[in-house]
């Protein structure tokens, strides 16, 4: 891709060690897009998706077969879907996430995210809060380790009660090729609305796993969560501040 596009400002390492200017990063994006298009031809994957979307029942093996059909990593296929779904299916309410998981430290890190149309609920936090363990993006790590699988795939419908948003989330986990104790997960979330129900027939399949989820434990209002990692201290603080503000307002009204 770099050669065909005649880019002289480019990156020579993966992962990136450093970049000297924005043009190198931009050219890397263009080259990656071009290479992905060559590896995953548009017409072929569009036809495959139409077949999958036309079925009344969700079948995980259909998606796993799609992800392994090309000479490309699951991440490349998921990235290609962020191009294909908006352009050919008019499905634009999407997010793309890449997590890493360190088995030694039990740490999760969100190191790549893309939001189309708007910033959706699952997004990075900069305050070391605990990401929701109900996300399929994180659950596939444990499944991958337990099953010793090279490619672990799963899907669920994630419901965000506080935002009144629902997403069909597809996720894949693989081992990091450079570090034995590190794993990666790639996921794509598709916003569920009336239009999606017309395009994806299996979206109402009762067999698809469904979970109420939050963003981080510290901001989550879900009660009795079996995988909560921390109390909802941010939410508790906001509620306490609101109670104080309401009490002050009542006093002002009473004595004014």
Predicted regions and their residues:
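Conserved binding/catalytic microenvironments
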Residues: 1-256
